[in-house]
Regions:
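Conserved interdomain linker/interface between the two RecA-like ATPase lobes of SF2 helicase motors
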Residues: 160-238
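A short beta-strand element within the Helicase C-terminal
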Residues: 114-117, 283-288, 293-301
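Post-DEXD/H (motif II) to motif III coupling segment of the RecA-like Helicase ATP-binding lobe
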Residues: 122-181
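Conserved helicase ATPase core of P-loop NTP-dependent helicases/translocases
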Residues: 66, 81-94, 235, 244-252, ...
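Walker A/P-loop
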Residues: 23-45, 237, 261
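Conserved Walker A/P-loop ATP-binding site and its immediately adjacent core
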Residues: 38-43, 47-74, 241-242
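Inter-Walker segment of RecA-like/P-loop motor cores
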Residues: 73-111
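Conserved pre-motif I regulatory segment
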Residues: 1-30
Length: 301
């Protein structure tokens, strides 16, 4: 028995899914941060498990594996129903009704043949082998994303479910209103792009990092934060590690306590940085692709 009840966005999503369930096999649920996509997945998973159906929930980042399991358990799903597909996790058990899987681990193994429903979290991230799994099987698939704007998604997901919008969540008070400040616009016209079957097209990292690390642009970022950031807890996203180091040093020179987290930052050190951030000792965490999901600290800028 779950310990939570659906909020307004989850009620809408469940109603829309029920009305389309028999007509389509694959669904994309487009819903912003703060709307409760993980809880929505828990409601659907609980319903499937009550009919002895097996569910797999695939996440793109390792930080989301234990976090998703913890959320499911908090919502009332029994811990003994959850197995893990992640490296050599001690709770690997393919017989359990719920499998929480790392995308990187899953695509390197033979896909299980007993799954009835597959969730793809952060489904806008292109993983070629996962897309092949969606295409080549007959089980139901639900993609979850706050930004499902990539054109390739329409090839694999038949039906779009959009239960709410960021505007509605802000008007209800579920999300904070926001302001944009962009004092300097970098010239990216000469930056080349690169593409791959796995991740699609994007700017070349080295070229865009050189522009984003320009002294004028970084200086404007620091000056703008000092003028408008109001000393609020802040997350800064950078292109490369060298870019992040440059930005961190610039904030430190300005007297702002900023720290850096990258993919190579050990887990224990990362937790200490986050703890200092939550306690107010660190004002800014500068990161490179590490705090893009599953970061629950209070951030105001």
């Amino acid at each position: 028995m779950l310990t939570i009840t659906p909020n307004f966005a989850q009620e809408r999503a469940l109603r829309l899914l029920r009305s389309e369930w028999k007509s389509h096999r694959t669904f994309m649920i487009s819903s912003p941060t703060g709307s409760g996509k993980t809880a929505l997945a828990a409601f659907i998973t609980h319903g499937c498990n009550s009919r002895n159906m097996r569910v797999m929930f695939v996440v793109p980042y390792t930080i989301l594996i234990e976090q998703t399991a913890a959320r499911f358990i908090d919502y009332g799903i029994p811990m003994e129903d959850i197995g893990f597909v992640w490296r050599d996790h001690p709770n690997y058990d393919p017989t359990r009704l719920i499998q929480i899987a790392s995308a990187d681990t899953l695509i390197r193994r033979e896909f299980p043949d007993n799954i009835d429903l597959l969730f793809i979290d952060e489904a806008h991230l292109r993983r070629k082998k996962l897309l092949e799994v969606i295409r080549d099987n007959e089980f139901k698939v639900i993609g979850l994303s706050g930004t499902p704007f990539s054109p390739f998604l329409g090839t694999y997901y038949e039906r779009l479910i959009k239960p709410t919008t960021m505007k509605e969540l802000i008007e209800r008070g579920d999300l904070s209103p926001y302001e944009f400040y962009a004092p300097t616009k970098p010239d990216l016209s000469a930056v080349k792009s690169t593409s791959s079957a796995e991740y699609g097209s994007d700017y070349k990292e080295a070229e865009i990092a050189a522009i984003m690390s320009g002294a004028d642009l970084v200086g404007d970022v620091v000056d703008n934060w000092l003028a408008n950031g109001q000393n609020l807890p802040t997350i800064c996203f950078c292109v490369t590690v060298s870019h992040a180091n440059f930005v961190t040093v610039a904030f430190n020179w300005a007297g702002v306590n900023a720290e850096i987290i990258t993919a190579d930052t050990p887990h224990e050190e990362r937790q200490l940085i986050i703890h200092r951030f939550e306690q107010g000792g660190t004002k800014i965490i500068v990161n490179v692709g590490t705090l893009v999901a599953g970061f629950d600290s209070d951030v105001r800028c």
